[in-house]
Amino acid sequence: MKLDLEGRIALVTGSSQGIGAAIAAGLARAGAMVGVNGRDAERLDKGIEQLRAEVPDGRFVAIAADVATEEGAARAVDALPTADILVNNLGVFEPRPALEITDDEWRRYFEINVLAAVRLTRAYLPRMMARGWGRVLYISSDSAVVIPPEMIHYGMTKTALLAVSRGFAKEAAGSGVTVNSVIAGPTHTEGVEEFVRELVGADLPWDEAQGLFMRDHRPQSLLRRLIEPEEIAHLVVYLSSPLASATTGGALRADGGYVDSVLP
């Protein structure tokens, strides 16, 4: 079984670090040329340097743009007019007491976590459909299904992505383009590590902090540990490949068994 993406062009939003960077590396290993996106040019350059160290024969191009804005999304599309694979990974999260989330915060989360993906899909999906092949993916979260009380604004956006993904899959029906979302479970990224330490204690050894977090805040996990970014990337690369040609309109889980359901 070969995940052959040779000759394909991919754009991964928010990919200078974390899950996005792992996805970019995985797609490059499978043969795709990858547009690596971030809004901070210096951080983006460092991210690409790290990716090239990980995947020496990988092909990466920097797409410096804040795709959470209308202007930034247009800049990204201008920089990479053709994409066979679009991975909408960009997202922000921060714990906030539910009744203290302001209108501006609700709008900001929707702009970054949802509208950025919608804008890019509107730009790339018609071009993919015209060519008769493409992959559009949305990185959602277990928080879309199991809404965390400390992050309901984040959970709302990730639920919205499931609806967006299913809707665009219907729009692309019969075109040769597949559209899916990935429900990622609690994942070990730099941002999540900071979040964990805020909740359980900044001075604890990491293994102990992770164990306490999973026990007290994510006890539903059957994995009983945080997922590594590469474990999310494996599913994304498969869904981006020709092997996943019959999978569309789905919300596929890489959640470590966190979502308590027998359904996918």
Model-derived segments and their meaning:
Residues A173, T178, T247-G249:
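Short, small/polar-rich loop/turn modules that mediate ligand/substrate recognition or access, typified
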Residues M1-E6, V146, V236-V237, T248-P264:
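Short C-terminal tail/terminal secondary-structure segment
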Residues P97-A98, E105-F110, H217:
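Substrate-binding pocket helix/loop in short-chain dehydrogenase/reductase
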Residues T121, T157, S165:
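Active-site helix of classical SDR
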Residues I9, S16-Q17:
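Conserved glycine-rich cofactor-binding loop
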Residues P126, K170-E171:
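Alpha-helical segment proximal to the catalytic Tyr-Lys
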Residues S141:
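Residue(s) in the substrate-gating loop at a strand-loop-helix junction
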